[in-house]
């Protein structure tokens, strides 16, 4: 059955879309990777081109990850995922797509499937310096680089950095930039990570989807957003536990959120709410005071939480809070 599906797909794709793909010169560096412990798949990329995240990275939970760049043929992304989802390895899928592409010489593409099979292609007419390095559970690729050492620097950084998939891919991007990066400069970046426990529902499977569309230092900004993303992951868990009245768990999550993003007063605010619900008023009051000084509207909002059951205190305690 899979053979029939793939055959039909190839006929439909290459007879209908081969001539209408939108080729765009996304000279860049990127990484595709699999975390074999968690099953997470990801792509991270930077380019001196607007909105690189809308074209280069393609990831599907439980299937694979693809980066399509140089003179981009976007079709490699969705078409490659379909082929891998229907049982092809990354190598087989990339081979088929390249064979059907008359302009493969200007393409740079990397694919990894859920089993860790990796394939990469750097066309002979990609602009120097252009190359790729394939390693266990990853591929790094770059074109139009200032120095030929960029891919190897990315590979070493990914292999040697200790952390989760986002940390390791971020290390690879930073290593590329430290080697000179894109010879034209820097403009946009993106990171996409999909869950290792696929549900088949895209929004549920998306662990991270961050895009820097246009920025003088997109790598630095992407790293900042990753930190904020982690903060809100903990904040969202805190909200969940607060709804369930699991106050100890909520306090733990809000504390972590505040540590990741201390410059946002709303995150410690919810920590103070959780502490008040635990009747730890002396711990909550100084946090409320600091938060209210930074954002007076949070003070106005506080009494409204009682009506919805998010703040479980009596009027006496509320008055103490409102006096801060």
For each feature predicted by the language model, list its residue ranges.
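Canonical tetratricopeptide repeat
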Residues: 236, 270, 304-305
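Register position in tetratricopeptide repeats
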Residues: 243, 277-278, 311
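Short coil turns that delineate tetratricopeptide repeat
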Residues: 262, 296-297
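Alpha/propeptide regions of enzymes that mature by internal proteolysis
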Residues: 18-184, 191, 213-244, 259
């Amino acid at each position: 059955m899979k053979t029939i599906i793939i055959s039909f797909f190839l006929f439909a794709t290459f007879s209908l879309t081969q001539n209408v793909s939108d080729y765009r010169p996304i000279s860049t560096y990127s990484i595709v990777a699999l975390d074999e412990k968690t099953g997470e798949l990801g792509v991270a990329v930077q380019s001196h081109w607007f909105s690189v995240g809308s074209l280069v990275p393609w990831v599907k939970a439980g299937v694979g990850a693809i980066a399509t760049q140089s003179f981009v043929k976007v079709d490699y992304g969705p078409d490659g995922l379909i082929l891998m989802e229907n049982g092809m390895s990354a190598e087989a899928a990339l081979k088929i797509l390249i064979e059907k592409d008359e302009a493969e010489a200007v393409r740079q593409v990397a694919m990894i499937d859920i089993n860790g099979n990796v394939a990469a292609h750097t066309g002979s007419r990609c602009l120097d310096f252009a190359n790729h390095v394939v390693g266990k559970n990853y591929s790094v690729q770059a074109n139009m680089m200032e120095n030929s050492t960029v891919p190897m620097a990315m590979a070493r950084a990914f292999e040697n950095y200790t952390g989760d998939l986002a940390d390791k891919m971020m290390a690879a991007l930073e290593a590329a930039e430290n080697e000179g990066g894109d010879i034209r400069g820097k403009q946009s970046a993106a990171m996409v990570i999909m869950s290792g426990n696929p549900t088949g529902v895209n929004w549920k499977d998306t662990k991270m989807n961050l895009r820097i569309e246009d920025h003088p230092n997109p790598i630095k900004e992407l790293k900042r957003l990753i930190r904020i993303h982690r903060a809100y992951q903990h904040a969202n868990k805190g909200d969940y536990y607060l709804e369930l009245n699991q106050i100890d768990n909520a306090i733990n999550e809000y504390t972590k959120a505040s540590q990741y993003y201390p410059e946002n007063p709303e995150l410690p605010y919810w920590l103070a709410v959780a502490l008040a619900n635990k009747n730890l008023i002396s711990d909550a009051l100084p946090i409320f005071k600091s938060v209210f000084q930074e954002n007076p509207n949070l003070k106005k909002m506080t009494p409204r939480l009682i009506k919805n059951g998010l703040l479980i205190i009596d009027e006496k305690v509320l008055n103490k809070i409102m006096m801060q």
